[in-house]
Amino acid sequence: ESELGAVIAHIDSVKPQLLIIDSIQTISSGAVDGAPGGITQVREIAAALIRIAKERAITLILVGHVTKDGTVAGPKLLEHLVDVVLNFEGDRHSRLRLIRAIKNRFGASDEVGCFDMTESGITSLTDPTGLFTTRHSDPVPGTCVTVTLEGRRPILAEIQALVSAPNAQDRDYGNSRRVTSGLDNPRTAMTLAVLELRANIRVSGRDVYVATVGGMKISEPAADLAVALSVGSAAKGLALPADLVAIGEVGLAGEIRKITGAQQRIQEAARLGFKKAMVPAGSDIKVEGIEVLEVARLDQAISKVRIN
């Protein structure tokens, strides 16, 4: 049904405990001016449905369209009318789908639910780490695992790097390539510059490719140290310890800065069997079963893993 009166009549007949409207922009009412999906229609229809839900103790889920930038399409007022706003997110090149709480009057708004897009449909993911890491039989140069936070949920992600000499023509003109996938390109370029100037790992005049495994998108600075270590490992052709995770923001002076949720991240790494964790100095992390390596500077981090 797409007419409000018919929807209400059906509610009266069925007396549901759960009501899902998909989507609110397609419902219309002859008693309200304007076209379906317009400001007046959406406001009045949503208000009427919310009123009925509260009067009859019905759990109401309103599905709304979103724009290309991910915001709720149509009138923004729809977000203000409801108690909880959940965004269903995902990249078409990745199997991971997220339900992220944007607004929550009854709890935390930084909670995230993880789901896997499979051939048989969407299934819940209790441990999404397997999508974004690879267990290598032998240590491989250019790989490093980090721990990122999706809301308050720690997820381990593998960063892979490849450093190679460009062709002769590119070398003559200094047109070395910098290609990233799943990472913030300007931030990665900054990390490469710091790696060369502060840790003496030469990457200028060489092609550098850095990517996340499984299509994971990482934008937080906490992955800087893992990016630097993976590139340094690839540049030197020396593998990092397979049981190592690295977290920390890299500053322009080469310092390793503290990050939020460090204890929670390392606890997740320990739970999944990692034995060493490289973290910013002063993080004061104590987790049973994992050795914590504190580093204050990038060159110190490079020395600890012996790729200098």
Spans of model-derived segments:
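Conserved nucleic-acid-binding Ia/Ib motif block in the N-terminal RecA-like helicase ATPase lobe
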Residues: 1
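Peripheral, non-AAA+ core regions of ATP-driven protein-machinery
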Residues: 4-18, 24-308
